[in-house]
A protein has these predicted regions:
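Charge-dense, helix-prone N-terminal extensions
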Residues: 1-148
Length: 148
């Protein structure tokens, strides 16, 4: 496992002790997400907060986690991650390529055969109805796989 020491070193440099490993579900992850939103302090924080609210409305049973130094939402498997960059906030759906997207929300990571993502830019409105449908489709896909 040559990569294991490198990951541990990188985690020490970029994250606090509480974030070193994947934080299990519950309040700790929720607090880290709150902290990320506050740290961003601009339109990206507002967008991430809105997206978080839409995810929770679409699936009140979604579990908030903190993995890979980003917010993660799951329900019987990964639903999506919420990443923030200088110019975008990105929701990456782990199994997005297998989801129907009739509203054509996916606009990033389109070339792969597993993930799909939605890039949100400053001032952009969220199509909440379509996003909720996509989140619910991801949950349905996860729960149907979990039952097998």
């Amino acid at each position: 496992m040559p990569n294991a020491p490198r990951k541990k070193t990188a985690a020490k440099k970029t994250t606090s002790k509480s974030k070193k490993a994947s934080v299990p579900q519950g309040n700790s992850a929720s607090r880290l997400i709150d902290q990320r939103i506050k740290e961003l302090g601009d339109w990206r924080g507002e967008m991430l907060a809105k997206l978080r609210a839409v995810i929770k409305q679409a699936d009140p049973d979604a579990i908030e986690e903190w993995k890979w130094d980003v917010p993660v939402w799951s329900h019987d498997g990964l639903i999506c991650t919420g990443e923030s960059y200088k110019q975008i906030v990105k929701l990456t759906f782990a199994k997005g390529a297998s989801l129907a997207d009739p509203s054509h929300l996916f606009n990033s990571s389109l070339e792969g055969n597993t993930r799909r993502a939605i890039d949100f830019h400053e001032g952009e409105k969220i199509d909440e109805k379509a996003l909720k449908a996509l989140i619910q489709a991801a949950v349905t896909a996860n729960t149907s796989r979990a039952r097998r």
